Amino acid sequence: MSLPNPAALISQMAADLNAHLAQRAISEPRFIGIRTGGVWVAQALLEALGSDSPLGTLDVSFYRDDFSQNGLHPQVRPSELPFEIEGQHLVLIDDVLMSGRTIRAALNELFDYGRPASVTLVCLLDLNAAELPIRPNVVGATLSLAAHERVKLSGPAPLQLELQDLAL
């Protein structure tokens, strides 16, 4: 399987996000990337949008519902939100949407900071494997992988996608 070029996806995502925000009459969204890949995608997306908006970062490690199964990630860092959440229009950005559990955890954490006016979900890739009813408003590409395959994003510059075979 050939993976898409992240730079080309980011360019199209910027156009799609602008259209989505315009349709909803959102003029000053607040951007938040989910560590680590989502932050890289958010930085590239802000650059493609020509935006100098501050970027918030979320580390959802403590909010995941599989925390007791997987344990604590060795590099947990605090979330950094340089703006209010209450009443704001948020653009939540992640690299890969698989089960939906990371996004659920991110939403739980965000609501601990306040009640946003809206949340627009942006993902570089949707792996079409959702376990929860979560879908991105803007997506770079949708892929279907075999059960033994995963996609890994490396970055921050350049962003590159790698297909990993867990069966090997």
From Swiss-Prot:
Keywords: Glycosyltransferase, Transcription, Transcription regulation, Transferase. The keyword Transcription applies. One of its GO terms (molecular function) is uracil phosphoribosyltransferase activity. GO terms for biological process: regulation of DNA-templated transcription. It catalyses: UMP + diphosphate = 5-phospho-alpha-D-ribose 1-diphosphate + uracil. Coiled coil: none annotated. InterPro entries: PRibTrfase_dom, PRTase-like, PyrR, PyrR_bifunctional. It comes from the Bacteria. Its EC number is 2.4.2.9. A motif (PRPP-binding) lies at residues 90-102. SUPFAM superfamilies: PRTase-like. Pfam families: Pribosyltran. HAMAP family: PyrR (MF_01219). Belongs to the purine/pyrimidine phosphoribosyltransferase family. PyrR subfamily. Regulates the transcription of the pyrimidine nucleotide (pyr) operon in response to exogenous pyrimidines. Also displays a weak uracil phosphoribosyltransferase activity which is not physiologically significant. This is Bifunctional protein PyrR. It comes from Pseudomonas fluorescens (strain ATCC BAA-477 / NRRL B-23932 / Pf-5). The lineage of its organism: Bacteria, Pseudomonadati, Pseudomonadota, Gammaproteobacteria, Pseudomonadales.
